[in-house]
């Protein structure tokens, strides 16, 4: 049985990437996902005790990558979805990346306890309610005005992505990480730039190794 673990990165968690990674491996996690914790919808980001700052997230990603890369080099690979995504994009295999890195949102049927349906678990908000699973068909839900509006929203990119050297990898990041007011901007933009500058050479090395392995299959 394969085990997939979703880890929410808080301010406290970000201080101990080595402990987090090793403990997840001890649990038998073969597939790992790390996402920044959510601040309350109302209010400023970064003011809660658990809030994850861009600087802390950048340091966390760099250290986590060191640990992950060391395992990969020892032929002890564990999947970390974010890193896998970047390698797939480098291999021009963007179809294997997820919505948080491909630059556009899809529409998923997220069903709440009362039957309400939303296009994404991060956007289970009244403005994006597509309908109700007990009252609407799947066709009606997928063709709803909210679904269409969400797909259009999901095509946007921050203006600073236009001239960013990392844009082909990052694609603006997950829309959930964007600032909640003002023009589109990823709250963790600096964290991602720090990470790419730190890990680029080794990401390329892994991508080349993966490409060679595929050619020998």
Question: Positions of the model-derived regions?
Answer:
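Radical SAM enzyme [4Fe-4S]-AdoMet core and its adjacent flexible, acidic
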Residues: 2-104, 110, 124-130
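Flexible mid-to-C-terminal extensions adjoining Fe-S/redox cofactors in radical SAM and related proteins
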Residues: 124-217
